[in-house]
Amino acid sequence: MVKAVVVLGSSEIVKGTIHFVQEGDGPTTVTGSVSGLKPGLHGFHIHALGDTTNGCMSTGPHYNPAGKEHGAPEDETRHAGDLGNVTAGEDGVANIHVVDSQIPLTGPNSIIGRAVVVHADPDDLGKGGHELSKTTGNAGGRVACGIIGLQG
């Protein structure tokens, strides 16, 4: 079993901790919570770079080793880092539980050292018809991010 963790932060009030667990070659389970969000849906993605030198903007595009268009987590055509949306309640807290086979913690496409980004707006899952739908899901600004690291 391989475990990883990311502590999310920003210059805003948004913060959280996300845990990743992968058993063997199986899917990766993602759990945790994010607080300080406005109520509603927020895009939740793995971005390509583990670089926060310019805040969340320097984390690059969505992690996309296969060179596909943006989509929903259940779509065949999607970025590996497309994990859809998280839903914040009236208290501003989003509880996260995702199981995904495209975000391994080991091997050539490992997400270790990459970034988790929570966005200001809903991800339209590539189906919104906006010019950004097929690249970012038109999910708006980056309100929190952190770098995924191995955990003992």
UniProtKB/Swiss-Prot annotation:
GO terms for molecular function: copper ion binding; superoxide dismutase activity. Its EC number is 1.15.1.1. Its main location: cytoplasm. It catalyses: 2 superoxide + 2 H(+) = H2O2 + O2. Disulfide bonds join 56-145. The keyword Ribonucleoprotein does not apply. Belongs to the Cu-Zn superoxide dismutase family. This is Superoxide dismutase [Cu-Zn] 1. It comes from Oryza sativa subsp. japonica (Rice). The gene is SODCC1.
